[in-house]
Amino acid sequence: MLVILLMVVVLALSSAQDPNRDFVVSSQDVRERQPSSQQGTVGGQSQESQLRDQQQQQSLQQSQEQQPQPQLQQTKQPQRPVKGQPLPQQQQQQNQRPRPRYQQPRRAV
């Protein structure tokens, strides 16, 4: 019983150390069966997929170039006057208007 348990543990450890071994063999078999035009792989990537990637990158670059770049200031924001510079006319007029006086409520005696 102990011998069987040890064998199972050894087999489990050996398969855990090299789990892709069967996959590598099967992928080599598939590569051998394919015609030579489909075997052209460079760095694990076929020529077709490389061409597809290049076309996608080129189209992405073209679409980015065609899109207008957003301007930094799209809306006019009121600017704070720098010390020593006069305020714009509209702000000067607003400052000259008299402000309504605050009346304190009368207290009942």
Curated annotation (Swiss-Prot):
Subcellular location: Secreted
Cellular compartments per GO CC: extracellular region
Region described as Disordered: 17-109
Domain of life (superkingdom): Eukaryota
Chain positions listed as propeptide in the UniProt record: 107-109
Compositional bias per record (Low complexity), positions renumbered to this chain: 35-109
Keyword match Secreted: yes
Modifications after synthesis and translation: Predominantly proteolytically processed at its C-terminus before secretion to produce the major form gliadoralin A 1-90. Further proteloytically processed after secretion to produce minor forms. Potential substrate of transglutaminase.
Location of Pyrrolidone carboxylic acid modifications: 17
Induction summary: By isoprenaline. Prolongend stimulation does not change the percentages of secreted forms (with gliadoralin A 1-90 as predominant form).
Residue intervals passing through the bilayer: none
Tissue specificity annotation: Found in saliva (at protein level). Secreted from the submandibular gland.
Keywords (A to Z) from UniProt: Pyrrolidone carboxylic acid, Secreted, Signal
Signal peptide region: 1-16
Transcription in keyword set: no
Function: May play a role in the formation of the protective mucosal protein pellicle involved in the reinforcement and protection of oral mucosal epithelial surface.
Protein name: Gliadoralin-A
Taxonomic source organism: Rattus norvegicus
Lineage of the species this protein comes from: Eukaryota, Metazoa, Chordata, Craniata, Vertebrata
